[in-house]
């Protein structure tokens, strides 16, 4: 049986998306999404925030680079992936990221929302 690692995130960009075009001609964009959690231990205490790296490919990458900016709200549906590599000191390293399969851009000027599949 195949395992499922899908995730839905709704948050705000911490910076403008960075885009690269690979030798293969494919485009990849990356940005970090700040996702606020609703729970707080006290009214004075700020809520917890998670910072999640998002990776988009091809047309989604180009659209994100064109339409999304720091502070803008976005909803990402994607797959949770783990990058693994060996550091210069020989230690094994890893990090989690979300590879977006669908993204919704909220709050675009002149539009209520835009969905890119």
Swiss-Prot record:
- Locate the SSB domain: which residues? 1-107
Choose one Gene Ontology CC annotation of this protein and give it.
nucleoid
The yes or no answer to whether the keyword Electron transport is present is no
**Which keywords describe this protein according to UniProt?**
DNA-binding
> Is this entry keyworded DNA-binding?
yes
Q: Which InterPro entries match?
A: NA-bd_OB-fold, Primosome_PriB/ssb, ssDNA-bd
Annotated protein name in UniProt = Single-stranded DNA-binding protein
Q: Which organism is it from?
A: Leptospira interrogans serogroup Icterohaemorrhagiae serovar Lai (strain 56601)
What taxonomic ancestry is recorded? Answer: Bacteria, Pseudomonadati, Spirochaetota, Spirochaetia, Leptospirales
């Amino acid at each position: 049986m195949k395992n499922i690692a899908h995730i839905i995130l709704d948050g705000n960009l911490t910076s403008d998306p960075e885009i690269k075009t690979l030798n293969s001609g494919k485009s990849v964009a990356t940005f970090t999404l700040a996702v606020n959690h609703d729970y707080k231990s006290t009214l004075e205490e700020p809520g917890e925030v998670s910072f999640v790296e998002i990776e988009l490919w091809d047309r989604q990458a180009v659209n994100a680079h064109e339409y999304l900016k720091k502070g803008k709200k976005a909803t990402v549906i994607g797959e949770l992936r783990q990058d693994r590599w060996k550091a210069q000191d020989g230690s094994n390293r890893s990090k989690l990221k979300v590879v977006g399969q669908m993204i919704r851009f909220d709050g675009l000027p002149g539009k209520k929302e835009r969905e890119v599949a």
